[in-house]
Amino acid sequence: MLTLLAILAVSYIIGSIPTSLVAGKLLKGIDIRNFGSGNAGGTNAFRVLGWKPGLVVTLIDIVKGVVAAVSVVAFFRHHPIGAFPDMNEVALRLLAGMSAVIGHVFTLFAGFKGGKGVSTAAGMLIGIAPVSMLMVVGIFLLTVYISRHVSVASMLAAIAFPLIIAIRKYIFELGSGLDYYIGLFGSPISFHDSLDYHLMIFGLIVALAILYTHRTNIRRLISGTESRVTFGKKH
């Protein structure tokens, strides 16, 4: 139990790192929550700071999820506090990742007012199901390019994930996942791309949660007032 609590606590602290707030202070000396949509996430960073800072913020928020789901769990597996949790590996990684997402949304370092958790949740899932998430990222980028709405891309990508898991698992009959081996700088690296059923259930819950957290964006989309991302230079 102590090991599980430690995993959740460390993951929460990592998720709480307020990336967009730090970027806003460093680049413009502002609290990004006072501009744009008022949200401290990647979407508002794109909107307020420009696409380059927005991209950096988003990538760092993604890394927070990967670290929580992969590195934190791996660390405490080798350095447990008492017994290591006897539970499904994917379920444990999902718990760690979700703790990071909660930290991102309710950040410890900024009055518990953070982002919407999309990028950190994406990072968590990249660490668990990288191939499926590569497809989701493709859908996200294509949607941003076509619609210029990061919010639309986030919602569509969230809906796509559980569908991709289900199609690969049941239609293509890939079972619980595949192991991949790649060469990097002359050294073989292996990783597992999970199709565990926990992912499909979790993906459905996350999709609903992301739709809920984007309800103001949906209202702005309906009214035609949702901001669009521009790929030119931000002045």
From Swiss-Prot:
The chain crosses the membrane at residues 4-24, 56-76, 94-114, 122-142, 152-172, 191-211. Pathway: Lipid metabolism; phospholipid metabolism. Keywords: Cell inner membrane, Cell membrane, Lipid biosynthesis, Lipid metabolism, Membrane, Phospholipid biosynthesis, Phospholipid metabolism, Transferase, Transmembrane, Transmembrane helix. It holds the Pfam family G3P_acyltransf. It comes from the Bacteria. SMART domains: G3P_acyltransf. It catalyses: an acyl phosphate + sn-glycerol 3-phosphate = a 1-acyl-sn-glycero-3-phosphate + phosphate. One of its GO terms (biological process) is phospholipid biosynthetic process. It is an enzyme of class 2 (transferase). It is found in: Cell inner membrane. Its EC number is 2.3.1.275. Coiled coil: none annotated. One of its GO terms (molecular function) is acyl-phosphate glycerol-3-phosphate acyltransferase activity. It is a multi-pass membrane protein. InterPro entries: G3P_acylTferase_PlsY. One of its GO terms (cellular component) is plasma membrane. Probably interacts with PlsX. Belongs to the PlsY family. Catalyzes the transfer of an acyl group from acyl-phosphate (acyl-PO(4)) to glycerol-3-phosphate (G3P) to form lysophosphatidic acid (LPA). This enzyme utilizes acyl-phosphate as fatty acyl donor, but not acyl-CoA or acyl-ACP. PANTHER family: GLYCEROL-3-PHOSPHATE ACYLTRANSFERASE-RELATED (PTHR30309:SF0), INNER MEMBRANE PROTEIN YGIH (PTHR30309). This is Glycerol-3-phosphate acyltransferase. It comes from Pelodictyon phaeoclathratiforme (strain DSM 5477 / BU-1). The gene is plsY.
